[in-house]
Amino acid sequence: MPHVTPAPAVRMRGIHKRFGAVQANADVSLQVAPGTVHGIVGENGAGKSTLMSVLYGFYRADSGQIEVFGQPVNIRNADDAIALGIGMVHQHFMLVDTLSALENVMLGAEPHWLLARAQAAVRLKLEALMQTTGLQLDLDCLVADLAVGDRQRLEILKTLYRGAKILILDEPTAVLTPQETGHLFQVLDGLRKQGTTIVLITHKLKEVMRLCDQVTIMRAGRVVQDLAVAEASIEGLAEAMVGRKVNIGRSHGPPSAPGQVLLQARNLLVRDALHVTRLKDLNLRLHAGEIVGIAGVSGNGQSELLDLLSGLLQPASGQLELGGRTFEASAWLDPGTARELGLAHVPEDRQARALVMNFPAWESAVLGYDSLPAYGHGGWLNHQHMRRATGQYMERFDVRPRNPELQSSKFSGGNQQKLVLARELGQAPKVLLVGQPTRGVDIGAIEFIYSQLRALRAAGCAVLLVSSELDEILALSDRVIVMYQGAVTGELPIADCSEARLGMLMLGGAVQ
């Protein structure tokens, strides 16, 4: 008998989707083979999440056609998608913390989800699913008590319970340790072997090469390339995404002798308003001319550490030495004093804490520094000087468009981040605290930000880098400190670091 090629699991033709003046998808066509893992990559704003939201029924395309397993379909909403066997796991989990794992699966899927008889039947089905997929977890545990990796397994179980044959995953490893990522990939590989079709939205090109069969690259709302992963390379994918060659890999150069200690923290203890310990017995030193990376799953005390060292948070106990001065918990430094002593801070959330979104760029570019002599004297502010300085920052840090009058919210994420970096690095700091410097930032902007941090290191600045991206920590750091539940679980020179070793420390293990 002649071989019959199966119909694609998904075929999208000529998809157009516009939001006001923004063309999010322009004549996009996509074909996903059944029983494969298909990666979709592209910079922020490339249109990949919009395309998958059209497939899942969150948005309706302005025009175009969709086929699922060879049949033309009209997907009006998520219920239609689920009925067609399409499931989606979002980057930000959609779970109810106060319900158990079992109840979360049943919620919205079973009309009598509170009845014991219904729960017993669903439990049997879920136990069978866990056995066949390897997605093991405690069904009676409250979601609030589940680890991040378990929450993701629960989200996948939810979609499979509802009959998903096509599984869309949006940045699934963003909050996972390397070990959790490895387990997830084992599960996804098993699902692929069982015939499930998986669409993976990601910006981590190593993961595409490791897991996917086929990859589609999008840029500016269009598909620019579609190829088998066996024919692809990380460098080629990055170039296709950006439209030019980029370099964001490791580039440490020869190790240099540590310079003088510019910041020293001892025995830091932080409790929140509910008296829950967030940092405990934390010791830290930063030397001139080094980048120290703080690795760990988000929520393990990294944010509190940045706030503490920048003067935004006061400890219950501990000591800090900075700029020749010593600060005790009872008389901690404030942000203004920190800036006067040469410490600059790039917060993790640029929109909420680094910029005023309805301010013009020139006002955002001088926040915290408007008392400098360059910006006025005698209590009078010289707005023209501020505008001129902002224009110079924009030129130096390649902020686009170069318009100091443009509202801060109108810049892309990458250009907002460059504006914040321009403000903080423009003062030639001795110590820089930087949180999540490339979160939501395109590859081209990442390359620029990396070059600026490396240049700062070469100029003798001490940089403390907090990042949830392990590749970023490994690419930039001279020394890595790992945090787990508010404490340091290990400290390693970069030469001794590997993803596996750091991953064990991120889970609370000891240095091997």
What are these regions (language model features)?
Residues P2-Q512:
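Glycine-rich phosphate-binding loops of nucleotide-dependent enzymes
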